[in-house]
A protein has these predicted regions:
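Accessory RNA-recognition modules of RNA-modification enzymes
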Residues: 1-172
Length: 172
Protein backbone atom coordinates (compact mmCIF):
# COMPACT_ATOMS: atom_id res chain seq x y z
CA UNK A 1 0.00 0.00 0.00
CA UNK A 2 1.50 3.35 -1.02
CA UNK A 3 2.18 5.80 1.80
CA UNK A 4 -0.23 8.51 0.57
CA UNK A 5 -2.99 5.91 0.32
CA UNK A 6 -2.20 4.66 3.85
CA UNK A 7 -2.56 8.17 5.24
CA UNK A 8 -5.87 8.67 3.44
CA UNK A 9 -7.14 5.26 4.57
CA UNK A 10 -6.22 5.93 8.21
CA UNK A 11 -7.77 9.40 8.09
CA UNK A 12 -11.08 8.05 6.74
CA UNK A 13 -11.08 5.21 9.27
CA UNK A 14 -10.55 7.54 12.25
CA UNK A 15 -13.09 10.03 10.89
CA UNK A 16 -15.67 7.24 10.61
CA UNK A 17 -14.98 6.06 14.18
CA UNK A 18 -15.28 9.57 15.61
CA UNK A 19 -18.12 11.07 13.58
CA UNK A 20 -18.99 13.65 16.27
CA UNK A 21 -15.44 15.00 16.55
CA UNK A 22 -13.55 17.10 14.03
CA UNK A 23 -10.70 15.02 12.67
CA UNK A 24 -7.88 16.98 11.09
CA UNK A 25 -5.92 15.54 8.17
CA UNK A 26 -2.99 13.32 9.08
CA UNK A 27 0.44 14.89 8.83
CA UNK A 28 2.67 12.41 7.05
CA UNK A 29 6.42 12.03 7.35
CA UNK A 30 8.79 13.40 4.73
CA UNK A 31 10.53 10.03 4.67
CA UNK A 32 8.45 7.08 5.93
CA UNK A 33 11.42 4.69 6.00
CA UNK A 34 13.84 3.53 8.70
CA UNK A 35 12.14 5.40 11.54
CA UNK A 36 11.24 2.72 14.12
CA UNK A 37 13.52 2.60 17.17
CA UNK A 38 12.35 -0.73 18.63
CA UNK A 39 12.01 -4.19 17.12
CA UNK A 40 11.06 -7.64 18.40
CA UNK A 41 12.21 -10.61 16.36
CA UNK A 42 10.90 -14.11 17.06
CA UNK A 43 13.49 -16.91 17.06
CA UNK A 44 12.58 -20.46 16.06
CA UNK A 45 14.32 -23.59 14.87
CA UNK A 46 12.81 -25.30 11.84
CA UNK A 47 14.31 -28.18 9.88
CA UNK A 48 17.56 -27.81 11.83
CA UNK A 49 17.99 -24.13 10.94
CA UNK A 50 17.59 -20.97 12.98
CA UNK A 51 14.81 -18.70 11.79
CA UNK A 52 14.74 -15.10 12.97
CA UNK A 53 12.55 -12.38 11.50
CA UNK A 54 8.85 -11.59 11.73
CA UNK A 55 5.70 -13.63 12.11
CA UNK A 56 3.75 -14.35 8.96
CA UNK A 57 0.33 -12.70 9.22
CA UNK A 58 -2.17 -14.74 11.26
CA UNK A 59 0.31 -17.52 12.02
CA UNK A 60 3.27 -18.53 14.16
CA UNK A 61 5.48 -19.11 11.11
CA UNK A 62 8.64 -17.00 11.12
CA UNK A 63 9.53 -15.22 7.91
CA UNK A 64 13.25 -14.51 7.76
CA UNK A 65 14.45 -11.27 6.22
CA UNK A 66 17.69 -9.37 5.77
CA UNK A 67 16.32 -6.00 6.80
CA UNK A 68 13.11 -4.21 7.60
CA UNK A 69 12.61 -0.94 5.76
CA UNK A 70 10.78 0.73 8.63
CA UNK A 71 13.33 -0.24 11.29
CA UNK A 72 16.19 2.09 12.11
CA UNK A 73 19.39 1.34 10.15
CA UNK A 74 21.27 0.55 13.38
CA UNK A 75 18.63 -1.97 14.43
CA UNK A 76 18.93 -3.61 11.02
CA UNK A 77 22.73 -3.81 11.44
CA UNK A 78 22.49 -5.41 14.90
CA UNK A 79 19.73 -7.76 13.67
CA UNK A 80 21.85 -8.83 10.68
CA UNK A 81 24.87 -9.42 12.94
CA UNK A 82 22.84 -11.60 15.31
CA UNK A 83 21.33 -13.53 12.38
CA UNK A 84 24.83 -14.35 11.13
CA UNK A 85 26.27 -15.28 14.53
CA UNK A 86 23.42 -17.13 16.22
CA UNK A 87 23.85 -20.89 16.40
CA UNK A 88 21.38 -23.71 16.95
CA UNK A 89 22.71 -24.09 20.49
CA UNK A 90 22.11 -20.40 21.19
CA UNK A 91 18.66 -20.41 19.60
CA UNK A 92 17.33 -23.49 21.38
CA UNK A 93 16.58 -21.56 24.56
CA UNK A 94 15.46 -18.31 22.89
CA UNK A 95 12.01 -17.04 21.98
CA UNK A 96 12.69 -13.47 20.85
CA UNK A 97 15.40 -10.86 20.41
CA UNK A 98 14.34 -7.32 21.25
CA UNK A 99 16.48 -4.39 19.99
CA UNK A 100 16.17 -0.69 20.81
CA UNK A 101 18.15 2.28 19.46
CA UNK A 102 17.77 5.67 21.13
CA UNK A 103 18.17 9.18 19.75
CA UNK A 104 21.26 9.43 22.00
CA UNK A 105 22.74 6.59 19.88
CA UNK A 106 22.60 3.98 22.62
CA UNK A 107 21.64 0.40 21.74
CA UNK A 108 19.94 -2.15 23.97
CA UNK A 109 19.64 -5.83 23.10
CA UNK A 110 17.30 -8.04 25.11
CA UNK A 111 17.40 -11.80 24.62
CA UNK A 112 14.17 -13.45 25.71
CA UNK A 113 13.93 -17.12 26.58
CA UNK A 114 14.51 -19.90 29.09
CA UNK A 115 18.24 -19.74 29.75
CA UNK A 116 21.03 -17.25 29.11
CA UNK A 117 24.04 -19.59 29.36
CA UNK A 118 24.36 -20.11 25.59
CA UNK A 119 23.99 -16.38 24.85
CA UNK A 120 27.04 -15.15 26.78
CA UNK A 121 29.43 -15.55 23.84
CA UNK A 122 27.02 -13.75 21.48
CA UNK A 123 26.65 -11.01 24.06
CA UNK A 124 30.45 -10.61 24.14
CA UNK A 125 30.61 -10.48 20.34
CA UNK A 126 27.92 -7.81 20.23
CA UNK A 127 29.56 -5.50 22.78
CA UNK A 128 32.93 -5.91 21.04
CA UNK A 129 31.46 -5.13 17.61
CA UNK A 130 29.05 -2.28 18.40
CA UNK A 131 30.68 0.38 20.58
CA UNK A 132 27.36 2.07 21.30
CA UNK A 133 25.73 -1.01 22.84
CA UNK A 134 25.22 0.09 26.43
CA UNK A 135 22.79 -2.58 27.55
CA UNK A 136 22.51 -6.32 26.99
CA UNK A 137 19.86 -8.03 29.07
CA UNK A 138 18.38 -11.51 29.33
CA UNK A 139 14.66 -11.74 30.04
CA UNK A 140 13.42 -15.05 31.40
CA UNK A 141 10.19 -16.22 29.79
CA UNK A 142 9.24 -19.87 30.07
CA UNK A 143 5.56 -19.34 29.27
CA UNK A 144 3.87 -21.22 26.45
CA UNK A 145 1.71 -18.38 25.18
CA UNK A 146 2.25 -15.31 23.01
CA UNK A 147 3.38 -12.96 25.79
CA UNK A 148 6.85 -11.79 24.77
CA UNK A 149 8.42 -10.55 28.01
CA UNK A 150 8.65 -12.39 31.30
CA UNK A 151 8.94 -10.81 34.75
CA UNK A 152 12.62 -11.50 35.53
CA UNK A 153 15.66 -9.85 33.98
CA UNK A 154 19.41 -10.36 34.23
CA UNK A 155 21.86 -7.74 32.99
CA UNK A 156 24.58 -9.39 30.90
CA UNK A 157 26.39 -6.17 30.06
CA UNK A 158 26.09 -2.49 30.98
CA UNK A 159 22.84 -1.08 32.27
CA UNK A 160 19.29 -2.38 32.35
CA UNK A 161 18.20 0.69 30.37
CA UNK A 162 19.22 3.09 27.61
CA UNK A 163 18.93 6.87 27.66
CA UNK A 164 16.42 8.56 25.37
CA UNK A 165 16.11 12.29 24.88
CA UNK A 166 12.77 13.91 24.16
CA UNK A 167 12.13 17.67 24.09
CA UNK A 168 15.37 18.30 25.97
CA UNK A 169 14.57 15.77 28.70
CA UNK A 170 16.65 12.65 29.19
CA UNK A 171 14.77 9.57 30.32
CA UNK A 172 15.66 5.92 30.94
Amino acid sequence: MRYAYQLDYKYKHVKKLFEDIEVKPILGMDNPWYYRNKAQFPVKIKDGKVQMGFYRQHSNDVVTCKECKIQDHVINEVFSFIQKKITLKMAQDLRHVFIRHSSTDEIQVVFIGKNEKNIVSLSDQLKNTFANITSIVFNYNTRNDNVILGDTYKVLYGNDYIIEECLGNKVK
